[in-house]
Amino acid sequence: PAIIKETGLCVWKSGKKPYLILKRNGDMLKGKMALYYTGISHDTPSYVKNNRDYNLLARSSRLAYTGVQNNNLEQLCTGINMNYEVQLKEGMNTLPVIENVIATKYCGGGFGGYILSVFYNKIDRDKFINNYQHLSAIKIEPYLNEM
């Protein structure tokens, strides 16, 4: 199981031992995020050997990082959507089009599980939550736990 030691909007450098590069309070995402369940379970380790477009994945990561660094929601969401393009190229199912979503992608390893959607504002996000209760849609908020 995952143990969350860092809160806020974090950028991690991946590798054998990931490390934290940048941490923000995440206020630019307040009132704008939702999670919902696809209804499909998944087994992330079984996808490890799949072909990946590492160039596109790296570009999406750099763009999202720049968005966090600049506190720019549009840049961050462009990076998220580019990551979703990688997921589609890997064979994941196309996600439903949801009104007023800036960005969307599978969480974690994808191929089922949870979906993250970022909306323009709290009104659009909350409308989605109310309309998609059958998908167990929930709002999520960034928070920063200062220790």
Question: Positions of the model-derived regions?
Answer:
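C-terminal nucleotide
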Residues: 2-109, 116-147
